[in-house]
């Protein structure tokens, strides 16, 4: 809702003289919106990159650390309450896509339509992929990324990435 109707909701909130708070729509309990808007307001963002979905990160972590197949890791996530009964939005990357659209709007002022952003989830990731990544010194993470180009244009996408094990993102 925030990714597609955020501008309209903000306008309505201003008309009604109320606050429009949407911190939980990106990152859940991890504060990112307020620091971007308040603490880093004087900074110029060139790129936003991160792991934006806890369900997919849990699944990939189970595959990486415990050798659990995708389907079994998804089932564990559902049993543990990390995944919805219908996890499609998470595992297909749509939830992360909506979040990177919100963050891109805040960082760059560019409004991306989530339906027009390149988005690939984790449903095709196999244990063989995880093993190959390990041999390369990497782990697989679903990353949302938005980039401001030198010409002022911007693009965003969500896709599985090979992340070097030394990267801070690998430890998430």
Please identify what each model-predicted range represents:
Residues 20-24, 47-50, 142:
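General beta-strand structural signal in soluble alpha/beta enzymes
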Residues 37-98, 103:
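Conserved anion/nucleotide-ligand pocket segment
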Residues 2, 66, 121-123:
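Charged, low-complexity surface patches
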Residues 15-18, 42-48, 153-154:
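Short coil/turn connectors at secondary-structure junctions
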Residues 1-39:
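Rossmann-fold NAD(P)-binding glycine/threonine-rich loop
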Residues 74-171:
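Substrate-binding/catalytic subdomain of NAD(P)-dependent oxidoreductase enzymes
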């Amino acid at each position: 809702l925030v990714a597609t109707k955020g501008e309209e909701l903000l306008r309505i909130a201003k008309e009604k003289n109320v606050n429009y708070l949407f911190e939980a729509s990106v990152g859940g309990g991890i504060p990112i919106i307020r620091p971007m808007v308040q603490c880093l307001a004087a900074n110029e963002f060139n790129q936003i990159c991160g792991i934006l979905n806890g369900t997919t990160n849990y699944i990939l972590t189970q595959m990486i650390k415990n050798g659990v197949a995708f389907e079994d890791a998804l089932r564990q996530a559902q049993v543990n309450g990390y995944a919805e009964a219908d996890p499609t939005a998470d595992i297909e990357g749509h939830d992360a896509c909506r979040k990177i659209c919100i963050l891109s709007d805040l960082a760059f002022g560019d409004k991306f339509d989530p339906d027009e952003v390149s988005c690939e989830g984790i449903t095709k990731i196999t244990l063989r992929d995880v093993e190959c990544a390990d041999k390369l010194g990497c782990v697989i993470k679903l990353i949302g990324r938005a980039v401001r180009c030198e010409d002022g244009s911007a693009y965003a996408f969500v896709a599985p990435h090979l992340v070097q094990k030394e990267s801070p993102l690998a430890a998430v």
